[in-house]
Each structure stands twice: as structure tokens, then as C-alpha cells.
Amino acid sequence: MMQESVLAQLDVSRETSEKLSHFVALVEKWNKAVNLIGRSTVDSIWTRHVLDSAQLRTHLASQPRLWLDLGSGSGFPGIVVAIMAAYESPESRFVLVESDQRKATFLRTACRELKLSASVLAARIESLPPQKADVISARALAALPDLCALAAPHLAPNGICLFPKGVGHISEIAAARQSWNMEVETLPSLTDPDAVILKLKALAHV
């Protein structure tokens, strides 16, 4: 029922629904050997992870040429947004960065099986050449000051960052502003009344 409810809320095509379901099955299968998501969240995977990831696409002003997902891990949000873009904006490319080799192998398997326009970089974010991304996302990766430092070298001139955050987001913004100039829009989360999505623009070091 949770699956049907989330898919209805997302209002996606049959093909997209099938790919999202396929991806969830892959996560559940691999999670037994590789710690992709917390075991306590498996039963709520459709709301806690799929919907929480998919909502990021609702905050785009235009379809990105390149979407960079940092610390992709289990593929939330990277794989989910790539699945949704496959039919809505097939020209968009996705780059998923994950330094853990086992998780990177999972991500490559998912991209291959789902036939996504996505590539996986099994490397540390700090070692990458500038990616010039239109959108950068990161979920449960680091505090905002650190996310700004990781993202800034890879943003296109008019690029945005989409960072889901929890109850401590106000203090994280204050801490980040000590070192970074930015425009911040705080957007409500569909999955948690205490959570937000931080949309950052014009990110530059002080």
C-alpha cells in the first residue's frame, strides 16, 4: 500500500513506476550484504527514501544538463532522480560519486540494469576535476559548511545545490555563513515535518 501511495503521489509513467520498483528490489537485495540503508528503514523505504529523494526534482527551475550526486551510497537521491529524468528529461546526465567500492559496485549494477544515463565515480569528492554541474545533491553526507566546501568547485556558474536537512538546519546555515556567501531558500519536506530541503545558489567562499 505504501508503494502504491507513493507512486500515485509522484504521478509518474508506468515505465518510471516499474524502474523505481526494480530499484527498490535491488536495494533490498543488496542491503543484506552491503549496508546501503538502515535496517530499521527498510519497511518504510518508499516514503523514507524514494519519496524523500524524488521530491528534489520538484524544486528545479529547468532540467539540468548535469546533475552531480555526492556520496551517492545507496542511490538515494541519485538513482531515483535519474530514473525520473529518463522520460521527463532524457538529455540530462547524472554523475554519482561514491568512494566506498562496494557501494560503487552496487550503483553501477543499478545503472546498468535500469539502463540509466548515469555514470559512477568511485573516488573521493575532493580528488575530482571540476564537474560544472547544474545541480548538486547530497543526502546525509556532511554538515552544511563541509557540503559547501565539497560542492563549490563543481558548480556551474548558475548551478544550485539541493541538500535535505533535519532539525539542525538553522544552526548549520549560520555556521556555513562564517565561510561562505550564498543565497539560501528553505523548502518544506514532503516526508518529515521537521525536515527541510536547502536550495543554495550563488555559492562563493568569503
UniProtKB/Swiss-Prot annotation:
InterPro entries hit by this protein: rRNA_ssu_MeTfrase_G, SAM-dependent_MTases_sf
Residues binding S-adenosyl-L-methionine, per UniProt: 71, 76, 125-126, 139
E.C. code: 2.1.1.170
Subcellular location field: Cytoplasm
Keywords: Cytoplasm, Methyltransferase, rRNA processing, S-adenosyl-L-methionine, Transferase
Short name of one Pfam family: GidB
Listed PANTHER family: S-ADENOSYL-L-METHIONINE-DEPENDENT METHYLTRANSFERASES SUPERFAMILY PROTEIN
Similarity comment: family membership: Belongs to the methyltransferase superfamily. RNA methyltransferase RsmG family.
Protein name (database record): Ribosomal RNA small subunit methyltransferase G
Organism listed in the record: Cereibacter sphaeroides (strain ATCC 17023 / DSM 158 / JCM 6121 / CCUG 31486 / LMG 2827 / NBRC 12203 / NCIMB 8253 / ATH 2.4.1.)
